[in-house]
Amino acid sequence: MHNVVISGTGLYTPANSISNDELVESFNAFVQQFNADNAAAIAKGEVEALVESSSAFIERASGIKSRFVVDKDGILDPKRMTPRIAERSNEQWGILCEMAIGAAQEALARAGKTAADIDGVIVACSHLQRAYPAVAIEVQAALGIQGFGYDMNVACSSATFGLQAATNAVQLGQARAILMVNPEICTGHLNFRDRDSHFIFGDACTAVIVERADLASSAHQFDIVSTKLITQFSNNIRNNFGFLNRAAQEGVGASDKLFVQEGRKVFKEVCPMVAELIASHLAENQLNVSDIKRFWLHQANLNMNLLIARKLLGRDAEPGEAPVILDSYANTSSAGSVIALHKHQDDLPSGALGVLSSFGAGYSIGSVILRKR
């Protein structure tokens, strides 16, 4: 059994950003046109009038101020409100592969590794571009990595589940090092005409190098002390888009073919589950919550993160204890907690302990205990 470390992280950020004000302007233009087009039916009570949104509402509900996106114009067009992403030929690298390459190159550089040092690729994300061939095998080919690759989807927890899979492979000697990447085009499955959720998601890609400790040489190493995962079935976060939709044409275009959630139920049910999993994980490793210097939590909602930290610590978290990146990135699904790790790790002293945690649809929750080398 080999000791395992994270030796490098990377981040790909799209060039385009949308502020709350821009998003609200587009949404309200759609609402005004809808209400005007349906004025007679609304007056008769046959159609419910839509309600405008505001930047203040979005920030109060989520803590989000802006988000990065792969396409801005298509989202902000009130007549479209969907990103415009052109199809590519089968001979071109796909857009998820392109994002993964950008994040992977930074992770490899921070780890001091090349493609020749990597034996496997795991693409772990919520929104895979296609059923097959696996996006991971495409990334593997694009980077010139020998070995194997596969895709996995555990929604917003995909990164922590991917980290456990990568850790197991390296521990058991099945690979010297694994590249785990999380390319997320969340805006592709978001209903920008839904007032309660149109502001939630952004796009990004993260990458992590997991390797044998005795082969690691970078200045950015974290021992992977332990991993713990849990799932519990729930319909409160769901997306029913899939290849079987064409076999049931009556459902094509229905709202459940995009992201839908029961937000209040998710908040009420998931927060205590996350706090309990992390607390039990620490106890199993003879650690106290007070031993943890940093919590890199899934970046879905500021109020959720504040509550989880409060449940764990018994008080409000200090600014550096549970860093927030969702104000500028929004919810990037599986990439969020890794963005927090990537941007808030270099200041930690040797020996400092941290917890990387994700939570989302499934329900699925992951906890990874890390120790700075």
Please identify what each model-predicted range represents.
Residues M1-W93, D194-K268, E276, K372-R373:
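Condensing-enzyme catalytic core mediating Claisen C-C bond formation in acyl metabolism
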Residues I6, L50, S54-V154, L282-N305:
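Conserved beta-ketoacyl condensing-enzyme motif
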Residues S7, A124, N153, I178-E184, ...:
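Short beta-strand segments
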Residues C97, I101, L108, H127-L128, ...:
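Claisen-condensing/thiolase-fold acyl-transfer catalytic domains that form or cleave C-C bonds
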Residues S17-I18, Y132-V135, L163-Q164, H189-R195, ...:
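Short acidic, glycine/serine/threonine-rich loops at helix termini
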Residues Q174-C205:
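Flexible, glycine-rich active-site loops centered on histidine and acidic residues
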Residues N182-P183, L190, Q232-N239, N301-L302, ...:
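Acyl-CoA/ACP chain-elongation machinery
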